[in-house]
């Protein structure tokens, strides 16, 4: 199994709105090899909010297929980083993707 983490640094106070965007999935569940998604808010941050999107996949290839899919492009077409040409300010200050091999998994 494989896990990808997309760690978002957000303007303070924007975590809940960002998390709510995930309530209506945009097709990730249709990608072969997708297994689970967790969207978390880091507690007790000072100057910014932090949201992590953790996705569990059958393999890294499955994740890469998601990144290269039309479904991914459609789901992310309205995501803005910092500010757009139209002057709209995005709550996303930065993001970083981390990749993990899952060596052990237990679920009750």
UniProtKB/Swiss-Prot annotation:
Give a GO molecular function annotation for the protein.
Answer: iron ion binding
The cross-references to InterPro entries, in alphabetical order and at most eight, read: ABM_dom, Dimeric_a/b-barrel, Heme-degrading_MO, IsdG
Q: Which residues does the annotation say bind Fe cation?
A: 6
Q: What is its EC number?
A: 1.14.99.48
Enumerate the UniProt keywords alphabetically.
Cytoplasm, Heme, Iron, Metal-binding, Monooxygenase, Oxidoreductase
Q: Which Gene3D superfamilies match?
A: 3.30.70.100
Short name of any one Pfam family annotated for the protein: ABM
Domain ABM span(s) in chain numbering:
2-93
The reactions it catalyses are:
heme b + 5 AH2 + 4 O2 + 2 H(+) = delta-staphylobilin + Fe(2+) + formaldehyde + 5 A + 4 H2O; heme b + 5 AH2 + 4 O2 + 2 H(+) = beta-staphylobilin + Fe(2+) + formaldehyde + 5 A + 4 H2O
Q: List positions binding heme.
A: 21-28, 76
Q: What is its main location?
A: cytoplasm
A GO BP term, please?
Answer: heme catabolic process
Give the protein's function. Answer: Allows bacterial pathogens to use the host heme as an iron source. Catalyzes the oxidative degradation of the heme macrocyclic porphyrin ring to the oxo-bilirubin chromophore staphylobilin (a mixture of the linear tetrapyrroles 5-oxo-delta-bilirubin and 15-oxo-beta-bilirubin) in the presence of a suitable electron donor such as ascorbate or NADPH--cytochrome P450 reductase, with subsequent release of free iron.
Quaternary form? Answer: Homodimer.
Which NCBIfam families does the record cross-reference, listed alphabetically?
A: PRK13313.1 (NF009838)
What is the protein named? Heme oxygenase (staphylobilin-producing) 2
The coding gene here is: isdI
């Amino acid at each position: 199994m494989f896990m990808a983490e997309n760690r978002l640094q957000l303007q303070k106070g924007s975590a809940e709105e960002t998390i709510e965007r995930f309530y209506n999935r945009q097709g990730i569940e249709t990608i072969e090899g997708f297994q689970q998604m967790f969207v978390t808010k880091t507690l007790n941050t000072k100057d910014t909010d932090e949201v992590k999107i953790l996705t569990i996949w059958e393999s890294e290839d499955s994740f890469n297929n998601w990144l290269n899919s039309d479904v991914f492009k459609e789901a992310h077409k309205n995501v803005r980083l910092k500010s757009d040409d139209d002057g709209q300010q995005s709550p996303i200050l930065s993001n970083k993707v981390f990749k993990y091999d899952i060596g052990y998994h237990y679920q009750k």
